[in-house]
């Protein structure tokens, strides 16, 4: 059933293969024949060929224009992507406001090195970073207090929750036994924002989402007994509506995210280093904060050794990229008769290239003319 519709806009909530699920804006549903949208305000869309030709990707979280709606089959075509406020590549999410990093205090035990790697990766996105620690009911008050004080030194104020009991998910502490364990609820923290939830596998991300949005019933897996790590249960990125308002993006779990940042930017991803740089400046503008004199960052703070480790990784990665670019610049791609591609060394200009017959003929004519002139 077709009609001359006005501009229909919506948000991409899921991407699978070449199809996009678009949740339409509330004003997209109209009176009369389109009242079905009130019950199912999601259209399964394809991407306009023009967008593909210009290289315009469609990501989860994108604000888009939908054309050619088929209200009976709930189909449509994405014809335009609005400019993005923010953009993440891994995971691919557009227009996110915050990253909610979820870890477990135990089962598996909380590893400071792994937590730091995830925090640095989250900080590198430029989004607001919130830290949520699950399974607080399985550790002692002393252990929990130690982690709270430790993370405060790192520059973070974590939320302690228990997915199993619901503590810290829906409401703040309600009695003296919970006082000191729960400062604020996750539900209230996420309202009105597009939040990307991420963290290693097996820490309870899917279970947390099931608590926040019970109707989803996401599949969960137990932690591997042999490896002490979680099994991946989320395979693709998807946005879910939160009952209290806002959207939550579930992402596949990772055990060790890759750090892909410039070495000079790394200090900005450590709150401790940022604080020191805000209070003073190093003697050298390009200080790497390793062995340079009069450095304000180098010093006695817990994660400084992690900073040095990640800095070395970033430097090695940068050198590998530069070497790779140089190698690619010296090669050219050739297509063989069977259709396969292969790379061959490029010849230096005017060094190994043979002169054309025309140039050779012209040279012979010039030589003959010189001989005639001498005669």
Locate the predicted segments by residue:
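Switch/coupling subdomain of P-loop NTPase systems
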Residues: 64, 96, 113-127
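N-terminal accessory targeting/assembly segments
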Residues: 1-112, 364-375
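Canonical P-loop GTPase G-domain recognition
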Residues: 138-203
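Conserved Walker B
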Residues: 105-106, 135-136, 251-254
């Amino acid at each position: 059933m077709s009609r001359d519709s006005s501009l229909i806009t919506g948000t991409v909530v899921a991407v699978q293969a070449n199809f996009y699920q678009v949740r339409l804006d509330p004003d997209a549903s109209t009176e009369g024949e389109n009242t079905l949208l009130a019950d199912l305000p999601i259209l399964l869309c394809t991407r306009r060929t023009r967008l593909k030709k210009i290289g315009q990707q469609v990501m989860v979280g994108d604000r888009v224009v939908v054309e050619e709606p088929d209200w009976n089959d709930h189909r449509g075509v994405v014809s335009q992507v609005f400019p993005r406020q923010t953009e993440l590549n891994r995971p691919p999410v557009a227009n996110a406001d915050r990253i909610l990093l979820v870890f477990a205090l135990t089962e598996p035990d909380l590893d400071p090195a792994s937590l730091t790697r995830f925090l640095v990766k989250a900080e590198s996105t430029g989004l607001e970073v919130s830290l949520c620690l699950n399974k607080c009911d399985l550790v002692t008050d002393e252990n929990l207090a130690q982690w709270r004080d430790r993370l405060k030194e790192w520059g973070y104020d974590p939320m302690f929750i228990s997915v199993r009991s619901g503590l810290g998910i829906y409401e703040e502490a309600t009695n003296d036994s919970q006082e000191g364990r729960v400062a604020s609820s996750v539900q209230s923290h996420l309202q009105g924002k597009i939040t990307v939830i991420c963290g290693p596998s097996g820490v309870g991300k899917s279970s947390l989402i099931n608590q926040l949005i019970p109707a989803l019933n996401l599949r969960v897996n137990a932690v591997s007994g042999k490896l002490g790590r979680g099994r991946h249960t989320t395979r693709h990125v998807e946005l879910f509506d939160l009952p209290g308002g806002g959207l939550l993006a579930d992402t596949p779990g990772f055990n060790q995210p890759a750090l892909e940042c410039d070495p000079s930017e790394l200090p900005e991803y450590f709150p401790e280093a940022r604080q020191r740089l805000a209070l003073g400046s190093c003697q050298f503008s390009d200080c790497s904060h390793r062995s340079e004199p009069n450095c304000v960052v180098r010093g006695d703070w817990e994660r400084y050794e992690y900073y040095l480790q990640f800095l070395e990784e970033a430097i090695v990665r940068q050198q590998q990229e530069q070497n790779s670019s140089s190698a690619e610049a010296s090669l050219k791609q050739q297509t063989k008769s069977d259709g396969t591609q292969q790379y061959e060394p490029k010849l230096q200009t005017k060094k190994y290239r043979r002169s054309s017959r025309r140039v050779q003929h012209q040279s012979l004519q010039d030589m003959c003319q010189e001989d005639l002139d001498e005669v």
